[in-house]
Amino acid sequence: MTKLHLTYYTSYYANYKNIPKDFLCVGISRFIPETFKYSNYNNFIWNKDNFLAPSIQLLSDIKNNKIDEDEYSKRYITEVLSRVQSYTGFETLAEWLVSFDNELAQQQTEWKAVVFMCYEVPSDFCHRHLLKKLFNNYYKIPIEELVLNKVNAKTT
């Protein structure tokens, strides 16, 4: 199993204000909520070219019922894996995550965890759940959905 400095979670934008301020929130959606564009959230980062986000075409196909969740899942994984090297220079998602984690550790920030965020609530089908499964099952890197009562119990 890959050893990381920080703990990694997934969550959704509507949950942002409940997330501890010492958790770095990383937007992994194709677009971000308007409130995030004009606010000074010190613990939120987002890149409009985010290689972890589904393509506009993939989003359109699922929203217009041209594909089902199984097809979306296959295409999303294929998209992300094909973009890793061109967007990051790394061969695998695991290598990218280790580098990202090391970079945060070298910055000597007070971050206790990283939260990958998008729009959908935990019960909805979403690419962040696919990303979490990919890290957990394929790379053996533990990432789980953020459950705040568990987190608050650990930090108090």
Model-flagged regions — what are they?
Residues 1-156:
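Residues lining hydrophobic/aromatic ligand-binding pockets adjacent to catalytic sites
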